[in-house]
Amino acid sequence: MGKIAEFLGNPGARPDVHHRAPTVDCKQYEEFGDSNDYKNDDVVRVVSHSDESTDDELCNVNLTETGAIFTSKGFTGLSKGFTDKTLDFLVRVAGSQAVFFIVWIILIIWVVIGIVYNAPFNWQVVMQDGQSIQSYVWDTLLMRQQLMSTHEQILICGRLKSRLASFKNYLTRSTPEEEKADCTVEANEVSSVENHIDPSAINGELPVENWYDRLSNVASRYMGSIAAMVIFWIGIFVWIGCGAIPKDAGNTPPYTGETTGSNPRLKKFSDAWQMYINTAVAVSLLICTTFLQNIRARHDYFTGRFLVDIFDMDEKIDYRIRKHFNDFETPHPVVTIESKKRSTGRKMIDWYADIIGTGIGVLIGVAVFATWIGIGSPMKWDDNWWLIIGTYTGLIGFLDGFVLREVYFRIVQHEEKNYSDVAKEDLELFQELGIECPEEFSGKAPEINTIGYRTSQYINRICSTPWSVLVSVIIIIGLICIASGLRWSTTGQLIANTPTMIIEEFFLLVLLQAHNWADRQRRVEVTALYARRRILLSYVEKRFPEVMMLEK
């Protein structure tokens, strides 16, 4: 690893992940009461920590009682520094209810001001600039949230695989004292597992605790639907048609005519016409990014709560097995989760994604905003100055939208493969032990075969290829050339802004839909994993009862 790359945060690197599950500490169980009083196990709440004595190359993962996940290394393989921890904190803040309500308050105030002052030009520019800056910051947080969430889930799978390998090693040993018939998990015991899980959770639905949750669920479902995409493009084509209607050209008298001459009063496809769609899309982007960040936070909280219980059961299983075999010394095996091979193009995309999602992107953003403020006085704070920051963040946000979608498509596939591997290993162990597992606990999401779903899947695949990122770069270069030809006038900047904002909003709808599908699949997998751990815990409790543990 080069010193320069390490200084910059090692952008683009995707090293293999090595992890060893910690060995259960018998003292933290027995300190709750007499070591022979196994009923006390039910009240134990374990905060799971990785074994700090492992080699430096191992990545540690810690899960708190609230479900928050913390890792010792980031997704590029480097230990987390102050900047990484700060960005992770901002990701959590951005998805909070407080930020959600603040955004809506700002939006309402902006609407009221527009009504009072009859929606002047600068009023629209303020919304576009504000939204562009917000979108620029949110893209950084969304990218980091995607990359860190997947890195955390891969480490979770590594923890589960490491312990599962030990479980398989211990449980498949046969001893003369054991009677497999006595530890068979009955059908009614398996059915009782469902009593511990909300039926909606088994289907991957987020729990609804209040009106806010209900609003978020409905909004994400409709904004990320194929119908919303169709309505969006209908609105765009209607707007294009309205461009043929002459509108205020923004010129000052004397006019050369109503629609003729070099200084007409009215003009087709005017700057005002472009401003209308820019403002409308800016509001839509503001709402969508806020909902997306919030939905991701709620999803992480949901899965985190299940993972706390899953790790607790893993600890209990590990304790009972090791107590039976009187072995608290043998460590769990090290599990290596290999990174997927990438083409040169995808490595470049990952490099850019890491620039967005690390401190480098923040530093670049601060430098750009400082420069923009600095040139305000020489430009006399005119309309062009107001538009400059919106144009920059709009073009960058346009590229970010393509990169976000392409990266998300790949990391979800990698994440799903690891959860699928855990489910496969679980079921193989169940088969060896003669444990029956209901089909609904296999971790497979309900199949959807509607026309709308297939259409949406096709759109998602098209929008998630490296070629789509290349096309976005070509479009940006073309728009920069056009704006330069117009000397970055108001019209030139609006031309650079308008198509990028439209496509960025469309990609955000596609991304929102992709998040809905992937998050639902993950919730199905996590709840199924929870159910399988309860079944395995029941098996272990029957196979190694208290009397047998006392005798040994």
From Swiss-Prot:
Residues 119-225, 293-354, 405-465, 515-552 are cytoplasmic. Induction: By iron deprivation. The modification Phosphoserine is found at S48, S50. Keywords: Ion transport, Iron, Iron transport, Isopeptide bond, Membrane, Phosphoprotein, Transmembrane, Transmembrane helix, Transport, Ubl conjugation. GO terms for biological process: copper ion import; copper ion transport; iron ion transmembrane transport; zinc ion transport. Residues 1-97, 247-271, 376-383, 487-493 are extracellular. It comes from Saccharomyces cerevisiae (strain ATCC 204508 / S288c). It is found in: Membrane. Pfam families: Iron_permease (PF04120). The keyword Cell membrane does not apply. It is a multi-pass membrane protein. The chain crosses the membrane at residues 98-118, 226-246, 272-292, 355-375, 384-404, 466-486, 494-514. There is a cross-link at K39 (Glycyl lysine isopeptide (Lys-Gly) (interchain with G-Cter in ubiquitin)). GO terms for cellular component: cell periphery; fungal-type vacuole; plasma membrane. Belongs to the FET4 family. Present with 573 molecules/cell in log phase SD medium. The gene is FET4. This is Low-affinity Fe(2+) transport protein. GO terms for molecular function: copper ion transmembrane transporter activity; iron ion transmembrane transporter activity. Required for Fe(2+) ion low affinity uptake. It comes from the Eukaryota.
